[in-house]
């Protein structure tokens, strides 16, 4: 009988059975095990979301790690990552499409004054606000990577004036793209609705702070689907309380789950989402994970390799 191919699995989001079922048709003989099982000591690959510090280094025969997300801060930030390991991330078209759906929903909530109308409904108040024109509403997408570029292009189909920012120069049809520090400031000052899909790196931690909120248009809306640690939460609350920003929709927080006593929950200008804008789907991502497992075990560089120095 052939020995199973043991792969270490760790995630708080999906039960191990979900990924086992997704990978079975693609890799017959594969067996997912947890890091505390004896078989894990012989495993060459780990697939993971948010592993505890020391877990990766404790597995002596690992050749590589696969992040069960596009972001990789959950593996790298504040944790030891052995330099000899290969490291791949997911770039799943489903996740890009899901993020585009969620951002479109939240952008339209602000564009069409949904919160105002819902509040009026509770008061049985038949009000009608002046309409906005999408072409005269500037939406800035901060982060134009694999997901952000799809989000930006999707918003152009609704005729919004879409601008975007990334660290390096990009070109996206219908989107005015900026880069560098000056470009970042231009997006802040220009956007009616600002959407962050930035990765969490040393350069982006706390990037949305009092200084940058003050540079945004008065009455602008802020949407964050990047990472919670990019926002100085007290500064955001202050910008909302001073009526500089009209509202904030947040899918990511500094601490997740968001503590029950956190002021975001009851703030009238904050919409809280539980990090569901673009969840990893084993069915759609299974092929990519199987391919990365095969490449790592064979000693090849996997597709969508992570540049550890850059953090993405």
What are these model-derived regions, one by one?
Residues 117-150:
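Glycine-rich NAD(P)-binding loop of Rossmann-like domains
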Residues 157-174:
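NAD(P)-binding Rossmann-fold cofactor-contacting core
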Residues 225-312:
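Rossmann-like dinucleotide-binding domain for NAD(H)/NADP(H)
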Residues 169-263:
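Rossmann-like adenosine-cofactor binding region
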Residues 1-43:
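N-terminal glycine-/charge-rich "phosphate-binding" loop or analogous flexible N-terminal tail
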Residues 102-130, 283-284, 288-291, 295:
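A charged, well-structured terminal subsegment
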Residues 44-118:
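Phosphate/diphosphate ligand-binding glycine-rich loop within oxidoreductases
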Residues 31-42, 53-56, 175-190:
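Short acidic low-complexity segments
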């Amino acid at each position: 009988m052939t020995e199973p191919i043991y792969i270490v699995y760790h995630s708080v989001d999906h039960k191990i059975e979900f990924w086992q079922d997704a990978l079975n048709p693609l890799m017959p003989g594969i067996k997912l095990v947890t890091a505390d099982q004896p078989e894990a000591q012989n495993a060459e690959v780990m697939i993971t979301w948010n592993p505890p510090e020391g877990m990766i280094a404790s597995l002596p025969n690992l050749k590589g790690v696969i992040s069960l997300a596009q972001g990789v801060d959950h593996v790298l930030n504040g944790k030891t990552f052995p330099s000899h390991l290969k490291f791949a991330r997911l770039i799943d078209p489903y996740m890009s499409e899901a993020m585009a759906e969620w951002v479109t929903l939240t952008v339209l909530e602000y564009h069409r004054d949904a919160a105002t109308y819902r509040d009026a409904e509770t008061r049985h108040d038949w009000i009608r606000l002046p309409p906005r024109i999408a072409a005269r509403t500037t939406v800035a997408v901060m982060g134009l990577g694999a997901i952000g570029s799809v989000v930006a292009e999707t918003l152009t189909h609704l005729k919004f004036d879409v601008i975007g920012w990334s660290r390096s120069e990009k070109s996206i049809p219908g989107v005015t793209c900026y880069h560098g520090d000056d470009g970042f400031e231009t997006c802040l000052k220009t956007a009616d609705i600002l959407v962050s899909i930035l990765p969490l790196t040393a350069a982006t931690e706390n990037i949305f702070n009092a200084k940058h909120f003050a540079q945004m248009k008065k009455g602008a809306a802020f949407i964050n689907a990047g990472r919670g640690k990019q926002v100085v939460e007290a500064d955001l609350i202050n910008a909302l309380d001073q009526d500089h920003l009209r509202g904030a929709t947040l899918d990511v927080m500094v601490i997740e789950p968001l503590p029950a006593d956190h002021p975001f929950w009851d703030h009238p200008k904050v919409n809280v989402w539980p990090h569901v804008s673009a969840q990893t789907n084993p069915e759609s991502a299974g092929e990519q994970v199987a391919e990365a497992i095969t490449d790592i075990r064979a000693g090849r560089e996997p597709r969508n390799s992570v540049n550890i120095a850059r953090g993405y």
